[in-house]
Amino acid sequence: MDLIPNFAMETWVLVATSLVLLYIYGTHSHKLFKKLGIPGPTPLPFLGTILFYLRGLWNFDRECNEKYGEMWGLYEGQQPMLVIMDPDMIKTVLVKECYSVFTNQMPLGPMGFLKSALSFAEDEEWKRIRTLLSPAFTSVKFKEMVPIISQCGDMLVRSLRQEAENSKSINLKDFFGAYTMDVITGTLFGVNLDSLNNPQDPFLKNMKKLLKLDFLDPFLLLISLFPFLTPVFEALNIGLFPKDVTHFLKNSIERMKESRLKDKQKHRVDFFQQMIDSQNSKETKSHKALSDLELVAQSIIIIFAAYDTTSTTLPFIMYELATHPDVQQKLQEEIDAVLPNKAPVTYDALVQMEYLDMVVNETLRLFPVVSRVTRVCKKDIEINGVFIPKGLAVMVPIYALHHDPKYWTEPEKFCPERFSKKNKDSIDLYRYIPFGAGPRNCIGMRFALTNIKLAVIRALQNFSFKPCKETQIPLKLDNLPILQPEKPIVLKVHLRDGITSGP
């Protein structure tokens, strides 16, 4: 039996030509870095270097740093990406030329109305939205929100107390995830959710669906391999985020706005109210006000960004404190000194706690939740002798930067003293960037730090955390794009001196 089909010569020529053209398309952009003299891993047709991400972005970036130095080239499907770790180049990309030459990160794919969110808006649109949102992220506004966050901290203490009294080991993500969700709904929408005790709440269920975006989803990989399909999916109203979820949240947020416009007597300090107020603020004289759809987009992206940062960082902090009891004790002593007799947390108290700041900074160095920050070049430029053509993505590998042994002594060691007043000045500003850097850094940085610190204070005022048999030591990281432990962080929670205070 003949295994090779008996096609006419013309058919074979057509098949061969099609395969050659397909190969050319799948590799046409993969010669750029060789042409520029920039090293990097060998890309595969169509896939580029994306399969290496299965090892974990954080791990792959560190391996590349060890092999290629402070600069290398990658290919996300067809998209070339220059990776830089030199502090001067990072400063130029993120600060000096952040407006004139570079714009926001590449869109992930078909975003629908979410493309107007601050994280994805470009150039003048980004400036307009950032200007309108900035007043909501000032120290004055955070002071007003501390009582809301404190209420969430009280609910966290109540939940942890039940586990401590029953001598149970706890999955920290369950408790700090619930705390984070309560903070988001409380500070964003003024809604008291108590998510740990109300898991079936429709608003909560839809927010959790929103947060399940899988960066290795086949649909997302398809967009990476064939970026020209993005406009097609946009036209078909197919997006990255589940349509039923965005539709539910959009309708819910619109109803909230209508309700608030009718009830003008109540004074509210949450982010949503401040975005509504911005639609009629003085800033709108020089900047077009947020549309209702843009207001919804900002609300959804705040949910998305705030949840991962806080709910992931808090378990990492508690793990390090549990495995470094001397650090935990020293931090508890500082908390007790600034807030004696388990006094309520204030914004001024947060600012005073130097050792708490050191612990949080060191944890974010070891475990930056977002392991990369990306910009896109708008025009040809040469930086430090390196030619960067228009359209090229430029990426800073934050995890690799924070773990580079050339700049950090024993980079895998948890050492809060790195960030003491004595040592902090010696740290290069562009070697430690857990929230990015420059004008386009994370607008919610101080908000996230406030949430994290308040939770740590309330927890350590009342409890001590210790490893148990389920605790993975040493901690291993998963291969997900957003930094996560391989296994849930499980610890034993103990009442301090057998007593607790609070609600």
From Swiss-Prot:
Binding site for heme: 442
Single GO cellular component term: endoplasmic reticulum membrane
Protein keywords: Endoplasmic reticulum, Heme, Iron, Membrane, Metal-binding, Microsome, Monooxygenase, Oxidoreductase
GO process annotations (BP): cytochrome metabolic process; oxidative demethylation; steroid metabolic process
Topology within the bilayer: Peripheral membrane protein
Pfam families: p450
GO molecular function annotation: estrogen 16-alpha-hydroxylase activity; heme binding; iron ion binding; monooxygenase activity; testosterone 6-beta-hydroxylase activity
Known tissue expression: Highest expression level in prostate. Also expressed in liver, kidney, pancreas, fetal liver and fetal skeletal muscle.
E.C. number(s) listed in UniProt: 1.14.14.1
Protein family per UniProt: Belongs to the cytochrome P450 family.
Function: Exhibits low testosterone 6-beta-hydroxylase activity.
Protein name: Cytochrome P450 3A43
Gene (UniProt): CYP3A43
